[in-house]
């Protein structure tokens, strides 16, 4: 099950991240998770939000370059090495992981957001391995 991630390209300058977040606030888009990757010139903000299309539209209207991408949210079992075991399943099928970042949804369980070169293949591997993922419907209830 894929979930939509909102990505925003932002200039790497003081206050720019706050401007993006203010646009989302005005649009009543709730942020569930985010990560920022930066270079000297620009940053890439990746967000899991309650309404990615609404967020994208609000940001585009305000002049921010943004897009929506399919990602997988994996529910991590609570034992040492659980993420390592999941990554071994993915690697065994030669699926490249583009990036990952954490997501905490209820304070008890951990999850990770994963973007792969082949999202459908990664989903199939996870499903076959009995690994729980989060649907967009589950995410919407948070």
Residue ranges and their predicted role:
Residues 1-142:
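A conserved regulatory-domain signal marking ACT and ACT-like small-molecule sensing domains
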């Amino acid at each position: 099950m894929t979930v939509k991630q909102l990505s925003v390209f932002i200039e790497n300058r003081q206050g720019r991240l706050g401007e993006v977040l203010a646009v989302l606030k005005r649009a009543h888009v709730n942020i569930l998770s985010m990560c920022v990757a930066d270079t000297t010139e620009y940053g890439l903000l990746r967000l899991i939000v309650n309404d990615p299309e609404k967020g994208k539209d609000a940001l585009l209207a305000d002049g921010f370059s943004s897009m929506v991408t399919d990602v997988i949210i994996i529910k991590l079992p609570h034992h040492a090495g659980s993420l390592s075991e999941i990554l071994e399943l993915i690697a065994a099928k030669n699926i490249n992981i583009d990036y990952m970042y954490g997501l905490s949804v209820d304070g008890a369980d951990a999850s990770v957001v994963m973007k792969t070169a082949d999202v459908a293949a990664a989903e199939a591997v996870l499903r076959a391995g009995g690994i729980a993922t989060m649907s967009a419907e589950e995410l919407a209830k948070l």
